[in-house]
A protein has these predicted regions:
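Flexible loop/turn segments at secondary-structure boundaries
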Residues: 91-94, 150-152, 185, 195-196, ...
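Acidic/polar loop patches that form or flank catalytic/metal-binding clefts of enzymes
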Residues: 217, 243-245, 335-338, 349, ...
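Domain-level cores of phosphate- or acyl-group-handling catalytic modules
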Residues: 193-251
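An anionic, glycine-rich sequence signature occurring as long contiguous blocks
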Residues: 7-14, 233, 238-335, 339-342, ...
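Dynamic "connector" segments at or just before major functional cores
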Residues: 1-168, 175-195, 202-212, 236, ...
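Short amphipathic alpha-helical "interface-anchor" segments enriched in bulky aromatics
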Residues: 84, 319-359, 367-371
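Basic, amphipathic alpha-helical segments enriched in Lys/Arg and hydrophobic/aromatic residues
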Residues: 347-406
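Short, conserved catalytic/metal-binding motifs centered on acidic residues
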Residues: 69-70, 84, 104, 108, ...
Length: 445
């Protein structure tokens, strides 16, 4: 029973100067698994990425610690910034971010208002440049998509976009994502978008990738809403192969549906577990308004829809079957966005201010990369979703011990510890700059 007049204990103020790394210090935490990501962050020079991006910081909470605090919420399946208060007294998580304790919700909210789109773009560029050699060294194809993040408050000042989960348009903040096709890693995002910016976003991603690698992407897959025909023409002029969907007009459908059966060629999609594999394809070359030159159109029956599906591509050497099979892989970006909504809580809108949301979206990209890296390291879990990885590995209690020349994380006994031991995530872990250049070591009972 609470004593009369007793008050709740007040947590300490986040201050990097109060972080103690004295040998012998031992900190208990119920989510010691978050330290599994430290070797990756140290190897990728995360602190240097933050400095190069120019994020603001203070004497109490440097920029690196502020961004690590925001990233921690994403890694720990927390819906809102206010949920950081769940860890007010978890000094081990403060140590993870280079602080004595994690900042409060008011700091994180205020901090996001101090950032600019240039900060996020520079950070994403550095992040992808360092992550690519580890997860997608031969990146060639990307799936692109818009995702409207619904707003449930006063809709004044916000544009209305179609919300698939509601089946109607509503006030929302529009975000854009690009995902590398094979690794399923999110590699670009932008939430500082208006409806006027929407048509040119595909080319902005192409420019982003060109700046990173010195060449344009080889293949892009996206639906009909992402780029008008004039933007498709610009992609063609830059020799970027694309496959997209064409909107179906009534007159166009009538013409195609009256074609004789001999015009339709059979094809089989070699995709395991796909329900509709046997197709019939009519392949033709057409011209479109605002598109310079010929373009290839594929009319397809057998995809499980009542009417034809129309594909457009500027690639002529590939077979029609291969183009459709390439586009079928675009479902991965929709799956990835579904994961971002369910685990990284993308739809829990941080604010009605787009720049504020842009920070949250950038943290989603970083958290996605962290979990894809973790999945790649664990034998048998390379295709595991973040929620599964979190439940089996990250959501593990443990003891963080500071020793003379290293930080040791002692994990509690769990059934999946042998998989972590086999992965040896801490092998050759570089010094962690925001922890006095101490390396991290993991031990398992």
């Amino acid at each position: 029973m609470t004593e009369p007049g007793a008050r709740p204990e007040i947590p300490a103020t986040a201050d990097c100067r109060c972080l103690s790394l004295a040998a012998g210090r031992r900190l208990r935490t119920r989510v010691a698994g978050v330290f599994l990501f430290l070797p990756l962050l140290a190897r990728m020079h995360f602190d240097q990425q933050i400095q190069q991006a120019g994020y603001p910081g203070s004497r109490l909470v440097p920029a690196t610690s502020a961004l690590l605090s925001l990233l921690t919420l994403k890694l720990l399946d927390k819906e809102r910034r206010s949920h950081i208060n769940d860890f007010n007294f978890d000094e081990a998580l403060g140590l993870f971010a280079g602080l004595n304790t994690l900042p409060k919700k008011s700091f994180l909210t205020d901090y996001s208002y101090r950032t600019q789109r240039a900060h996020q773009r520079t950070l994403l560029a550095a992040w992808v440049q360092n992550l690519a050699p580890l997860l997608f060294p031969q990146a060639e194809a990307f799936s692109l998509d818009f995702h409207p993040i619904p707003y449930r408050g006063d809709p004044s000042g916000l544009e209305r976009h179609y919300l698939p989960r509601r089946g109607r348009a509503g006030p929302s903040v529009l975000s854009f994502f690009a995902q590398e096709q094979e690794s399923r890693v999110l590699c670009f995002a932008n939430a500082n978008l208006t409806r006027a910016d929407q048509p040119g976003e595909v080319l902005r991603f192409v420019d982003f990738w060109h700046e990173l690698t010195g060449h344009d992407p080889q293949w892009l897959y996206f639906d009909s809403k992402l780029a008008p025909y004039v933007e498709l023409s610009r992609l063609n002029q830059r020799q970027v192969n694309f496959v997209t969907i064409r909107r179906r007009g009534a007159a166009l459908l009538r013409r195609l549906e009256t074609l004789p059966a001999s015009h339709w060629k059979p094809a089989v999609l070699d995709i395991p577990k796909r329900r509709h594999q046997h197709l019939r394809i009519f392949d033709e070359t057409i011209r479109l308004r605002d598109y310079d030159g010929p373009i290839r159109q594929l009319a397809v029956k057998g995809l499980g829809r009542e009417r034809l599906t129309l594909f457009l591509s500027n690639n002529f050497p590939e077979t029609g079957r291969n183009l459709i099979q390439r586009y079928a892989g675009r479902n991965r970006v929709e799956d990835g966005l579904g994961i971002s909504v369910n685990f990284f809580h993308l739809d829990c809108l941080a604010s009605e201010v787009r720049l504020n949301v842009d920070v949250d979206v950038a943290m989603t990209v970083l958290a996605n990369g962290c979990y894809r890296w973790l999945a790649r390291q664990l034998r048998g879990f390379d295709k595991a979703a973040p929620k599964q990885l979190y439940r089996k590995f990250v959501e593990t209690g443990g003891l963080v011990e500071v020793q003379d020349n290293r930080i040791v994380v002692h994990f509690d006994k769990r059934a999946h510890n042998p998989i972590l031991r086999e992965a040896a995530l801490d092998h050759a872990c570089p010094p962690v700059p925001w922890l006095n250049n101490l390396p991290v070591v993991f031990t398992y009972p």
